[in-house]
Amino acid sequence: MTTYGLLIFDGAEELDFVGPWEVFTTSSMLRHHADTVLLLAERTGAIRCSNGMRVLPDHTLDGHPPLDVLLVPGGEGARREMANDVVTGWIRETSASAAWTAGVCTGALLLHEAGPARGHNVATHFAFEDALEARGNVTVVRDARYVVDGNLITSQGVSAGIDMALWLIGHLHGRDHARTVRRYIQYEPAPPYLADEPTADRSGID
């Protein structure tokens, strides 16, 4: 059993955590609901995300079970949370005990501020690569969909978190399982979007 904890906060980019949430919960469902996937926030009550979606956390930062995987999303709220000692301290402490720490988009900046990304190779949203690199003590890997460095995994922006999450469940449960999850959620990142040439993969689910 794997326990995933996805940090949320006001201004978090929705797909940064909803994409991995879909991957993790589908993985659990296909394995007879073997895992626990949780949304965690500093406070109770609705969290208003970057584009207006409101979500409710399952637990607060001081009242959740131990985590195997910690995921930190980006969004404009992530830059604000860099000045929040409660959140950065919690990330630092929780990352130290988790088997995996993950960051999506500008969540890499928050992970750098908190500590786990320092001294590591990381990916982030292309618009923030220079800003992250300027912070020092980090190697920004450009043009990489996601980067694995030790037990830290980071991805580019928004939808890239889905690819990162698929890699992680493939590492934890096997590549065949990850392929089954990808087919189940019908995630087909190639070929690129073509407005006048809709296509669909009609292959069955193994």
Tell what function each PLM region has.
Residues M1-T101, A108-E113, R118, D130, ...:
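Extended, subdomain-level signal for the structured scaffold at the beginning of enzyme domains
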Residues G103-V104, I153:
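Short, flexible segments with low predicted structural confidence
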Residues T124-F126:
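Class I SAM-dependent methyltransferase SAM-binding "motif I" and its flanking Rossmann-like core
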